[in-house]
Amino acid sequence: MAGQQSPTVAILEGAQSSGKTGRLLERARALLDGGCDVADLMVVCASKDAAAAFKRRLGFRVSAGPESVERLRVVSARALSYEALADKDAQTLYGHGPRVLLDVERSILIADLRQAGMGKEDLAAACKELYRAWDTGELPEPQGEPARRYVDALAAFGAYDVRELGARAFNAVRSRPEIAQRLGASHVLVDDANLIGLAQLRLIEAFAGQELLLAGDCGVANPFFDAAATGTSLARFAQARAVEPTRLAQAPLDFPEDTFVVKSPEPLTEVQTCAKTVKYILGNVAVDLSQDLELTEAASAAGEGGTQVAKDGCEPIPFDDLVYPNEVCVVIPQGSMLKDACQKLKAAGIATVTCTESQSVGGDPRRVASVATLQSFTLLGLAADERDLMCWRTWVGLGRADISAKAWAGLVAYAAERNMHVLDALASLDASAPEPFEGAELLAKRYAQACALIAKASRKHGRQLIDIVSPNENLTFTRLCEPVVAQSAGKFFSRANLAAVDRGFGGRLWDVRVGIPAAFAGLETKACVLLGLNEGVAPRATHEEAPARFENECRLWRALLHKARNWLTMSYVQGAAPDHAQALGARVKRVKRATASDVAMLAPSVLLRELGMAEPSTMGAQQFVACVLCDTL
């Protein structure tokens, strides 16, 4: 039983492509096929997306099939901390549930402390000491006035600092061993342990009864947790437990020169581009060449049957739903099948792009085509024309359940042929007209739905308002309206009103070239809810209804946008059309042409990490951060 004895600790260390996750999958499969009850096994991953992918892949490996792992606990490290703090015994210790301080709340908290006279250096030193203590699992009494005021401010919000979360959970379990007995497991496996904070690793250890198996790269740190410490959390954990990690050799990268390959079908998969690690949101994806007649014929002519490329826990999906025609970023498992799969794709005539650790992506960035998920939405790397390379590295929520990637790619081609912006092309569609490309009727229908929803929201509130609710509560809106909201909103916001936005709040209708288009800040008397973000901090009250609340909420947005702007330094306004760049005027120091590596640098999860939002609680938060490449305040 967890919490009653010290588990046997083992660490698998290896670089990318060394098979760490595969080893964990095999260990989990061996336990389950050997008769281990699912209640005696728990898997912890660095993120909730990675946890979901691990569970899917494991389901295809166990002999009893995916249904046998439905009850298996595969959770993120943060979710495990939440579970510990939500336990009734933890509640008696701390008095409130596990709510983490939002990044925007922290920004405004610090701004208030600074305005109250606290020096920047004093505050930084106080936070550094607190972070160092929390990272190791300690809950010290704050020393000095700055630290006390910061902790008091956290208490006033009724929230924990995100670094404090693991420390609070660990101390709750240490003080109440019965929590670990209820929530723990005999065997605990941890993937990407180097990306998990040290306090959370100690918490995970407390939940392990007999075996604790961790996998990660001791040389790759998570700057969010390890910035104030020497060495990665995994390396320090190994040193404290006197455990010598087992080193796994990295698999050789032996790809055809013109092949772009992502190594494995995991939600957070690292791709080496210009020696910079970029994380893409991927799904459990494989390619079945037999699903496409032309490709099958081409493969057969080359002596290669239209056989399935990947079988390592992957569900084949129709080729049309995965790729932009003839341009594909293929997601296949690592291992001995890799080179063979690449050769089959090459024989089938699929245009691909080189991307290895020592070589940057070459060729036209538009060829870095698509990465599709099996869940809610599709990542595409598409461009309408050379002038607008960054237009629609799309992250729009037009999920494969409704509209295929090929249909969206057709829209891009349609726009390029007519020298139109993608949104303009979408707005011009008429479902009753002859279809200019596959999927046009459905896209037009979705556009009409978006317009109707916005109009309904405006009538309901009696003012010009885009009222966007939680993605969890209104999937129809968040999945269908994002790519068209800028055009739709133009019917409700005149140029005069947009000018009022500039004067009153300092924002404007953003013409975003990366991520999701169009977010709105509040007018002087009419507040608008920012697209997709439902964390309870968007301006929802007018100035007349609640002046103090309205002003405070506006300050929250200013703080977050200011932080985003400072990191981006406006050097990533790549691909902006000339008229857009000119409109930005003196606010933009430099506008440069986008390259494929720039596209990679703006991967949503990288931007999230840089903004201190390691794991937002909603996809809306990710959508917002992905679209902050915009006009500055």
Stretches with model-predicted labels:
Residues 1-56, 189, 198-386, 507-515, ...:
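Conserved motor-region signature of P-loop NTPase helicases/translocases
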Residues 1-18, 22-23, 40, 95, ...:
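Accessory N-terminal region flanking or inserted into the helicase ATPase core
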Residues 10-13, 38-126, 148-152, 236, ...:
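Conserved P-loop NTPase-based nucleic-acid remodeling module centered on helicase motor cores
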Residues 34, 48, 304, 609-633:
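C-terminal, charged and often intrinsically disordered regions of DNA end-processing helicases
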Residues 69, 208-212, 564-566:
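A short helix->loop->beta-strand "cap" motif at the edges of active sites that frequently abuts
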Residues 74-76, 161, 169, 509-518:
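Conserved two-lobed SF2 helicase motor
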Residues 90-108, 234-237, 282-286, 368-401, ...:
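A polyampholytic, Gly/Pro-enriched intrinsically disordered region
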Residues 381-598, 607-610:
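Conserved helicase C-terminal RecA-like lobe
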